[in-house]
């Protein structure tokens, strides 16, 4: 059977603005850093893959000296790991509070896919505990148990590297032309395309202006009939999903995509995770 594979952050819920950003800022305050990322600054940091890597991007020699931080590699590695543990704890508490409900259409299309026998998965290099918490709030604990979850340090390279999607389809045992990825960012799209998957993009708060060339469908959200409707922003396969993207639309997408030439991700769309691969093999946002 086909597979429906979701990214987590920005796809299952609007976690960036209402979860990750305040968790980063709470951590900076807790460790005594004179830093508070604005929406605009965080949008720029999101072009860097990985939470510790985003924190590491602050560590210029001037910033390190001004804030009396470790200047050696090992000291910085341990410091970033500690900051990230605090940030993950703050974020997980926010998710548990229910402050981030699932995005429109997520619970609905998951039920449609489950009823049709599709395999369900999440492929995210965010911390597994964070992914599981968001997933359970988005679709319910009972349905979340039906998902295969590929997260955290299960792969060492972060998106736009396709490793997480390659692992997911291999473990699921599904042909790559029978899997649909749902992403919200150019980095995620490039990862899915690099693995040979068709990709639906549901734009989110910080990604609306990114380049989604190669996406099979770009929408404002998956949409809910009678609720928050979907708006098609790019529809190269002429799916015409209407107010909601339904499973039948994804089935037609797979049929049409398999008959089309392979789509390759455009180079240079966003910053790769090469930014700081030595800092960690354990992720997250």
What are these regions (language model features)?
Residues 1, 117, 176-178:
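A general structural motif
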Residues 1-8, 12-104, 115:
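N-terminal helical cap/lid subdomain that shapes the substrate entry/recognition surface
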Residues 13, 120-123, 181-182:
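Conserved SAM-binding loop
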Residues 24, 101, 106-136, 192:
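Substrate-recognition element of Asp-dependent hydrolases with the DxDx(T/V) motif
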Residues 59-66, 119-125, 135-138, 147:
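N-terminal-biased segments
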Residues 111, 127-285:
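Asp-based, Mg2+/Mn2+-dependent phosphohydrolase catalytic module
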């Amino acid at each position: 059977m086909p597979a429906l594979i979701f990214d987590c952050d920005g796809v299952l819920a609007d976690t960036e603005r209402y979860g990750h950003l305040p968790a980063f800022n709470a951590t900076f305050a807790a460790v005594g850093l004179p830093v508070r990322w604005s929406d605009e600054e965080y949008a720029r940091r999101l072009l860097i893959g990985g939470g510790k890597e985003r924190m590491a991007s602050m560590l210029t020699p001037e910033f390190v000296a001004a804030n009396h931080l470790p200047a050696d590699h090992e000291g910085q590695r341990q410091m970033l790991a500690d900051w990230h543990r605090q940030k993950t704890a703050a974020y997980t508490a926010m998710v548990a509070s229910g402050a981030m409900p699932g995005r429109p259409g997520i619970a609905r299309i998951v039920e449609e896919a489950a009823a049709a026998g599709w395999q369900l998965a999440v492929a995210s290099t965010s911390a597994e505990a964070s992914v599981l918490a968001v997933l359970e709030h988005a679709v319910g604990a009972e349905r979340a148990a039906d998902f295969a979850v590929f997260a955290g340090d299960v792969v060492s390279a972060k998106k736009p590297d396709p490793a997480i999607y390659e692992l997911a389809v291999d473990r699921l045992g599904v042909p790559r032309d029978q899997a649909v990825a749902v992403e919200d960012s150019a980095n995620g799209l490039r990862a899915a395309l690099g693995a040979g998957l068709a990709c639906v993009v549901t734009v989110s708060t910080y990604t609306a202006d990114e380049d989604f060339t190669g996406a099979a469908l770009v929408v404002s959200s998956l949409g809910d009939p009678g609720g928050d409707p979907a708006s098609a922003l790019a529809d190269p396969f002429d799916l015409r999903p209407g107010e909601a993207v339904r499973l039948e639309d994804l089935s037609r997408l797979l049929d049409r995509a398999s008959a089309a030439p392979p789509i390759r991700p455009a180079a240079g769309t966003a910053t790769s995770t090469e930014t700081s691969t030595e800092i960690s093999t354990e992720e997250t946002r």
